[in-house]
Amino acid sequence: MTESPLLSVRHLSVDFIMHDGKMGHALEDVSFDVFQGQTLGLVGESGCGKTTTLMAIMRLLPANARITAGQVLYNEQDLLSLSERQMRGCRWKEMSIVFQGAMNALNPVMRIDEQVREAILLHHLMNWSQATRRVGELMEMVGIPRERVGQYPHEYSGGMRQRAMIALALACAPSLLFADEPTTALDVMIQAQVLALLKKIQEKLGLAIVLVTHDLGVVAEVCDSVAVMYGGKVAEAGSADSIYNSPQHPYTDKLLQSFPDLNRPSGDLASIPGTPPRVTDLPPGCRFEPRCHRRIEICATTAPPMLETSAGHRAACHLCEGPVANF
């Protein structure tokens, strides 16, 4: 029997009303699956829609944004059909998020243990003494020494604050964890420690993780599957092995060429000319066409369909061959 995904995003589209009144198409037709115990990496340049995708799934979009199409199925229940009260019951208990920039996400005037305990008590999961024990368990799990749990965020290093954010996200024992650029602004050694911690916690708790990053090294380290985003759309998706060893979309290919390869340290790194499209001025055809080194005439006028190029591997490119992906 085929395993059902824990999270299934289908044809998700999001529009923004910009400050000048123009409509911006932040996401269009985004689809992917996330399975229990596995990590999906959402990869792409800044502004491609990665964080917007997470916020749409959790229904935490700003007031000037709206979901215009699609489904977000969590355990086969469409989250977009829930009332706000029902959705509040789902957040933190079923799915949680490690926000980018722990210093900004943590309350600067509350001790770390107070913040984690408050999250538990707000969701009526335990009484005060039970919540306090739970805080101790979480801090031990993420590697924060007992003598430091009562300190304030500014007393922590960047890596320690990130560990505290992970503990806070796990406070209500979710099954699905979103991690939005969890290693940003951390040095290489601390990045490795945070990634190892996420992997260890995932193995212990059986979590599904959606990891947002622009760092292909992070993806190679921890992800089972990858969705490469560009201009608010999924350009290519598949297992991490197939994406790295056999990229089908020109954008993915260029991204990988721009990443250092230790097997050929003297090789030149590729660059992608131009800039990503603005959400208010998207190309009529393929979003990547203005920057693509392999474009053909049809790319400028017609958006490519998402094709299944091999089992579990799909790409939206006119140069690819295969049946239309069944999403």
Question: Predicted segments — roles?
Answer:
Residues 1-246, 315, 321-327:
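ABC transporter nucleotide-binding domains
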Residues 3-5, 149, 237-327:
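Short catalytic/signature loops enriched in Gly
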